[in-house]
Regions:
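Conserved donor nucleotide-binding strand/loop of the catalytic core
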Residues: 4-8, 19-47
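Acidic ATP/Mg2+-coordinating residue in the GHKL
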Residues: 12, 16
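Glycine-centered short loops/turns at secondary-structure junctions
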Residues: 26, 77-78, 158
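Acceptor/aglycone-binding surface of glycosyltransferases and processive sugar-polymer synthases
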Residues: 32-47, 52-55, 64-144, 148, ...
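Hydrophobic helical membrane-anchoring modules
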Residues: 140-293
Length: 293
């Protein structure tokens, strides 16, 4: 599909002959000892130096013929990420299982609510990236939750991105998916929560503070009414608990303000790192781009 591209295959401790077959076909094979897709993505962006990155899983489920179209969209529209959203023919229920489809829709919706964006397939493993995206991506995840991190990185830095529908096929006979619907879904959900805390700390701690403040008010109102009527505070432990809850609410809000300032500074640093690299269109106009890899 991309005859001018350099092909890199990252072998994540596979037990078959994938690495040997890829090497015989002319691909550059890199062994990644640390298990997990996130570890592979981290190594890929660190080791490969390219102007355009096409990332796909090695299970033959994604349409390789769509790669030129995705690359063209990236270059023509001067984007930093193009996601190949999965569309199956519906003839085989195992192609895109209902549980995976529902989980993807739920998690994609959660990210859209928390971080914005209009993606419909956040968990797609078929993506095209610009050089400045790849070199500014911190890649902290270890497993399948890396797709969530890839998406949120683009949304947080307000990078231009797009989504293109691509065919999604059944895995080859004898091939078994390593994705666990519940285990990996739970890990992805935890990643979304962690990213919400780290990227939206003021909102997170404000929610916690508001809940604590409401609890404090609910506890103190009856105590205060009794005091107004009798001049006594018969439920002293309740009054102490209400005071502690209000102090915790104020402390939570202050923590949110401090963490938000730290997050903005970190985001500015990533943005400057991102802007230090020319865009795809600029590299093409200067004759720097040498084709996707």
């Amino acid at each position: 599909a991309l005859p001018e591209a350099d092909i890199h295959v990252f072998d994540n401790n596979s037990s078959d002959d994938t690495a040997a077959v890829a090497r015989a076909a002319g691909a550059t094979v890199t062994h990644v000892a640390l298990r997990g897709k996130g570890n592979v993505v981290r190594r890929m962006f660190a080791d490969v130096d390219a102007d355009v990155y096409v990332m796909t899983d090695g299970d033959a489920t994604y349409d390789a013929g769509a790669a030129p179209r995705l690359v063209e969209r990236l270059v023509h529209d001067n984007l930093d990420m193009v996601v190949g959203s999965r569309v199956d023919d519906g003839q085989d229920a195992h192609t895109y299982r209902a549980g995976h489809r529902f989980g993807n829709r739920m998690l994609t919706g959660a990210v859209a609510q928390l971080f914005g964006g209009g993606l419909t397939d956040m968990l797609s493993g078929y993506r095209v990236f610009s050089r400045r995206y790849a070199k500014s991506f911190p890649a902290l995840s270890r497993g399948f939750e890396t797709e969530t991190e890839l998406t949120v990185h683009a949304l947080e830095l307000r990078m231009p991105y797009a989504e293109e529908a691509t065919a999604y096929s059944t895995r080859p006979e004898g091939s078994v998916s390593k994705l666990s619907t519940y285990r990996d879904g739970w890990r992805i959900l935890k990643t979304i929560c962690k990213l919400f805390v780290s990227e939206r700390p003021l909102q997170f701690f404000s929610i916690i503070g508001a809940l604590l403040a409401l609890m404090s008010v609910a506890l103190v109102v009856p105590v205060f009414m009794t005091y107004v009527q009798t001049g006594l505070v018969p439920r002293l432990p309740t009054a102490v608990l209400a005071t502690g809850a209000m102090l915790a609410a104020m402390l939570s809000f202050v923590c949110g303000v401090i963490m938000q300032a730290i997050t903005l500074g970190r985001r500015e640093a990533k943005r400057l790192s991102y802007l230090a690299i020319p865009s795809v269109r600029e590299r093409v106009s200067r004759g720097l781009a040498v084709g996707p890899r």
